[in-house]
Amino acid sequence: MDSRIFLAFSLCFLFTLPLISSAPNRFLTRSSNTRDGSVIKMKTSASSFGFDPTRVTQLSWTPRVFLYEGFLSDEECDHFIKLAKGKLEKSMVADNDSGESVESEVRTSSGMFLSKRQDDIVSNVEAKLAAWTFLPEENGESMQILHYENGQKYEPHFDYFHDQANLELGGHRIATVLMYLSNVEKGGETVFPMWKGKATQLKDDSWTECAKQGYAVKPRKGDALLFFNLHPNATTDSNSLHGSCPVVEGEKWSATRWIHVKSFERAFNKQSGCMDENVSCEKWAKAGECQKNPTYMVGSDKDHGYCRKSCKACSS
């Protein structure tokens, strides 16, 4: 099957997983005696996936936006902020031509990146993100922690790429998850200027003028916002244009997880040199898995395996 057709089919399947009849609406559990015969059973908070679909609201189809209330606990939010404090640097943007990270007045926040699986809390949140989005952990970039002080913002932008260099690292960012780590007294809303139903959202004086330019979501500690940057046919979605409105009162902390079409982890490691991509590689190699399971462990020149370093298939 042509890879583009397969990708488009996969995306169509992914985007139809949260089957919801109208916006906004809640994920519901349908009984098995539905008239049309379609049976959709959503698990509750006791789910082994570690997330509760009953807390998810579909906000929009154009772009595809979902809000998860209480995705993070207060302890998780506070832990992320603690990890970031003292390590923040001025936020950068990707140059549209070269793909290099450059400073810009478009983005005035400060931030830092956590390491993947940095500790148990980070690992648990990464697993929960994969369960909610139905996208593999390895497709995600490291989480970025952002801090916005009074007046700081991120003007409307796209999360998909315009340069070839970034596309080589797992392809486009298919989805973005914004996690709010703090409450904001006023401002700091996430705004979607291109949302077709923006006129239906009534806003009082508690919203900033920036937020009134589109459909907007107020930051609330623990909530998470998932939106897709690509259409189901794998083309870029201009409706996903979004920004972070200036903070007017207080401060804003958030965490961002960008998720790619393909494995970001493998593409990044391939560029970085000879590396293992699983913590158990050395143990597996000693057990003879390099010979027993060469496809996974070693791979080929075109499709590298996950344990090339331990299998001595490359030199660091």
UniProtKB/Swiss-Prot annotation:
Residues glycosylated per entry: N96, N233, N278
Membrane topology annotation: Single-pass type II membrane protein
Cellular compartments per GO CC: endoplasmic reticulum membrane
Residues given in the record as Fe cation binding sites: H157, D159, H242
Compartment(s): Endoplasmic reticulum membrane
Listed transmembrane segments: 5-24
Residue sites binding 2-oxoglutarate per the record: K252
Cofactor: Fe(2+); L-ascorbate
Coiled coil: none
Enzyme class: oxidoreductase
Topological region Lumenal: 25-316
Gene Ontology MF terms: iron ion binding; L-ascorbic acid binding; procollagen-proline 4-dioxygenase activity
UniProt xrefs under Pfam families: 2OG-FeII_Oxy_3 (PF13640)
Start and end residues of each ShKT domain: 274-314
UniProt topological domain (Cytoplasmic) ranges: 1-4
Principal place of residence: endoplasmic reticulum
Domain Fe2OG dioxygenase: 139-261
Catalytic reactions of this protein: L-prolyl-[collagen] + 2-oxoglutarate + O2 = trans-4-hydroxy-L-prolyl-[collagen] + succinate + CO2
Disulfide pattern: C274-C314, C281-C307, C290-C311
Enzyme Commission no: 1.14.11.2
Alphabetical UniProt keywords: Dioxygenase, Disulfide bond, Endoplasmic reticulum, Glycoprotein, Iron, Membrane, Metal-binding, Oxidoreductase, Signal-anchor, Transmembrane, Transmembrane helix
Cofactor note: Binds 1 Fe(2+) ion per subunit.
Recorded family membership: Belongs to the P4HA family.
Function: Catalyzes the post-translational formation of 4-hydroxyproline in -Xaa-Pro-Gly- sequences in proline-rich peptide sequences of plant glycoproteins and other proteins. Hydroxyprolines are important constituent of many plant cell wall glycoproteins such as extensins, hydroxyproline-rich glycoproteins, lectins and arabinogalactan proteins.
Protein name: Probable prolyl 4-hydroxylase 7
Organism lineage: Eukaryota, Viridiplantae, Streptophyta, Embryophyta, Tracheophyta
This protein's encoding gene: P4H7
